[in-house]
Design a protein with these regions (language model features):
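Short, flexible loop segments at the rims of nucleotide/cofactor-binding pockets, characterized by
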Residues: 97-103, 169-174, 210-212, 258
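Non-catalytic C-terminal accessory region of glycerolipid acyltransferases
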Residues: 3-7, 74, 114-117, 141-144, ...
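Catalytic core of membrane glycerolipid acyltransferases/transacylases, capturing the structured
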Residues: 118-176, 200-206
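A conditional alpha-helix N-cap/helix-loop micro-motif detector
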Residues: 102-105, 129, 155, 173-177, ...
């Protein structure tokens, strides 16, 4: 992939900082309202990715009316833009802010801390629902020793900006030679590992029943849990009355006597995705229906 020129790097970075400066100047609720208005215009007026998104929704919810599907599409896109606003404002989201905007945040931190205190780390699987970053931001702000993986941005200045936005979350760079070693080491040290499980992977891995179809997802997160003996917490974020709700769907534990570790990781992955599937069907407007990598796209073997 071609390296960006200094002119392009600086233009992209300062354009981003200008936009961020504007978002940070206005009150939080006003910014969230503007984001929702932009989403309404994009979905209802300009029909942004409308055909593709509506086709996905119809395939998953054939029983729902067009009006209801359009509402889900709008709320899903509004959630994306509002999450972007919160990403920009992330360094300003203090613990007091979390107390006001994250329902029972301290309670869930203590619950996760109890797993960390077992000494084998914990794998936290949170899908693309609500502001999934908020799950990590809030838990880290309450003091949970948490880390995640992230891809390196092509623009080095934007990459550094992203690292600052992660705040109290330790970030392991995806794709480096030591990524897998670092993840295993941190779990063995008793850290919490946040991971997105609802991503389609290109190479055949674990086929799961999901949203009425078959999805090919990675067993990577579960494999770390199996190797380290870590519990897996499956949770979903969603928005409710202007606040963030952390729904704990279940805690899965690997079988320490399992001889086939790959099969055990596959079992855990399927169980986690089944829990997530059930929740998405209850609250579809909170899930990311606009993802370019459609999770139900068949894998070419």
């Amino acid at each position: 992939m071609a390296k960006k020129s200094n002119l392009t790097i600086n233009f992209e970075y300062y354009l981003l900082r200008f936009f961020c400066g504007f978002v940070n100047l206005i009150p939080y609720r006003v910014a969230m309202g503007i984001a929702a208005l932009f989403a309404w215009s994009a979905v209802r007026v300009f029909k942004l990715r409308n055909k593709r998104t509506m086709a996905r929704l119809r395939s998953v919810f054939p029983e729902k009316s067009e009006k209801e599907l359009k509402r889900i599409a709008f709320r899903s896109f509004a959630n994306i833009l509002q999450s972007g606003v919160e990403m920009i404002r992330a360094p300003r989201l203090t613990r007091k802010w979390m107390d006001r905007h994250v329902v029972d945040g301290q309670y869930y931190k203590d619950r996760l801390q109890s797993y960390v205190d077992e000494g084998k780390g914990v794998v936290i699987m949170v899908p693309h629902s609500g502001n999934w970053y908020m799950a990590a931001w809030s838990m880290a702000k309450y003091g949970l020793p948490l880390f995640a993986i992230a891809a390196k941005q092509r623009n080095p200045k934007i990459n550094d900006w992203m690292k600052r936005q992660y705040g109290d979350i330790e970030v392991v760079e995806r794709g480096s030679a030591r990524t897998l070693v670092e993840i295993k080491k941190k779990l063995e040290e008793g850290r919490a590992f946040a991971i997105l499980p609802d991503l389609r992977v290109k190479e055949p891995d674990v086929e799961v029943d999901f949203l009425g179809g078959k999805a090919n997802v990675s067993r990577g997160g579960a494999m770390f849990a199996v190797k380290c003996g870590s519990p897996i917490v499956v949770a979903v974020m969603r928005r409710e009355n202007g606040k963030h709700v952390f729904d704990h769907l279940g805690t899965l534990r690997p079988d320490p006597d399992a001889e086939d570790k790959k099969a055990e990781a596959a079992r855990l992955t399927k169980e986690a995705m089944a829990l997530i599937d059930e929740k998405i069907r209850l609250y579809p407007e909170h899930w990311f229906w606009y993802n370019k990598r459609w999770i139900l796209e068949p894998v070419h073997k």
